[in-house]
Amino acid sequence: MSLWLGAPVPDIPPDSAVELWKPGAQDASSQAQGGSSCILREEARMPHSAGGTAGVGLEAAEPTALLTRAEPPSEPTEIRPQKRKKGPAPKMLGNELCSVCGDKASGFHYNVLSCEGCKGFFRRSVIKGAHYICHSGGHCPMDTYMRRKCQECRLRKCRQAGMREECVLSEEQIRLKKLKRQEEEQAHATSLPPRASSPPQILPQLSPEQLGMIEKLVAAQQQCNRRSFSDRLRVTPWPMAPDPHSREARQQRFAHFTELAIVSVQEIVDFAKQLPGFLQLSREDQIALLKTSAIEVMLLETSRRYNPGSESITFLKDFSYNREDFAKAGLQVEFINPIFEFSRAMNELQLNDAEFALLIAISIFSADRPNVQDQLQVERLQHTYVEALHAYVSIHHPHDRLMFPRMLMKLVSLRTLSSVHSEQVFALRLQDKKLPPLLSEIWDVHE
């Protein structure tokens, strides 16, 4: 029997998460879920449709109104020139010259006929509040050559020609103006009645099977978290010795972290046993999947406990760990920094319990793990969870089309972190830090 599927943990009673594979463990877990609250009832009432996403087709051309022939006027009509609207003049099409330097003008800029060069120069000068100094007394003749030599005279000529500083918009004003225009266009688009030729929009939806699966995952995760929390309270306490650099303090910190890791592994095994389809796999494939995915799931769970304000991670109530604490426990900076960077990136996504549970399930059901025999079945199971996550994200993030691919890319980042973790384990061996038997078997550390 594999050691890590039933290894006892010091100071943790037999009825805790250590008894990972007793026959009655699964039934007890199922009964515990019966009274869990459903957080997804609202989606269940959403209208169903046969497809997932609507195909976009060509819209039919709108009917064109017939033009009636105009009757000839009985009296001659007086033709009056139209008055030009207020605002900047249209772009020049001839050979007009810049009023500042004499170069070819491109249009009216800031109320003056000017070239692109003088337009940009005036804008930069106003935004920066620049003050230039002329070394020739301030009387330089301005042309295409001198405009590069004397900035003070060029700016003075811009103002003399009539360029107005109040016409220059700052970057923030331009951004707000663009944003306002986009909002107006969007409001106008939503106010238009739908065209008869437009296909009806098919809303994303969760099937009853997907809804039930997500509810089960969330309930299982909450149950495992409650159980592991009580186990975490029994680990070796963090040392508060007067000499934090003493050998005893270092050993105590290392034991503290390794025991936390053991509890996390137990939580992962408990959760995996409640994943639909997991127990139908062979025992060998169950072990292969859990051994290689354990560190990735641990890092996902770690990211949930990340506090961006203090840049710390809370494993125990009212006790947070920063980068320095990880280093004091014997971990290398090359492993610590990626952990915190990954946790920060995950925190920015603001995932909820259902999204985390689905990501963990997708990570566990990876058919490319070493020693997996029935890869086809594992792929099918993973595809089920990927489809459920896609449907769930489409409902909860309808305006963020990149949310789903961003979440899957985090699983790619976890693979990189997993290889860094292997190097960390090797470094611990070089430091003569002996891992507990359970962790040694999971991470294939052979003494």
From Swiss-Prot:
Provide one Gene Ontology cellular component: nucleoplasm
Tissue/organ expression: Visceral organs specific expression. Strong expression was found in liver, kidney and intestine followed by spleen and to a lesser extent the adrenals.
Q: Which parts of this chain are annotated as the region Transactivation AF-1?
A: 1-96
Q: Which GO terms describe its molecular function?
A: cholesterol binding; chromatin DNA binding; DNA binding; DNA-binding transcription activator activity, RNA polymerase II-specific; DNA-binding transcription factor activity, RNA polymerase II-specific; nuclear receptor activity; RNA polymerase II cis-regulatory region sequence-specific DNA binding; sterol response element binding
Pfam families in alphabetical order:
Hormone_recep, zf-C4
What residue ranges does this record give for the DNA-binding region? 95-170
- Where is the protein situated, by its record's location annotation? Nucleus; Cytoplasm
| GO terms, biological process | apoptotic cell clearance; cell differentiation; cellular response to lipopolysaccharide; cholesterol homeostasis; hormone-mediated signaling pathway; intracellular receptor signaling pathway; lipid homeostasis; mRNA transcription by RNA polymerase II
Induction text: By 9-cis retinoic acid (9CRA).
Protein transport as UniProt keyword: no
* Record-annotated NR LBD domain positions: 209-447
CDD domains in the cross-refs: NR_DBD_LXR, NR_LBD_LXR
> Which proteins does it associate with, and in what oligomeric form?
Heterodimer of NR1H3 and RXR (retinoic acid receptor). Interacts with CCAR2 (via N-terminus) in a ligand-independent manner. Interacts with SIRT1 and this interaction is inhibited by CCAR2. Interacts with GPS2.
| Protein role | Nuclear receptor that exhibits a ligand-dependent transcriptional activation activity. Interaction with retinoic acid receptor (RXR) shifts RXR from its role as a silent DNA-binding partner to an active ligand-binding subunit in mediating retinoid responses through target genes defined by LXRES. LXRES are DR4-type response elements characterized by direct repeats of two similar hexanuclotide half-sites spaced by four nucleotides. Plays an important role in the regulation of cholesterol homeostasis, regulating cholesterol uptake through MYLIP-dependent ubiquitination of LDLR, VLDLR and LRP8.
What is the recorded name of this protein?
Oxysterols receptor LXR-alpha
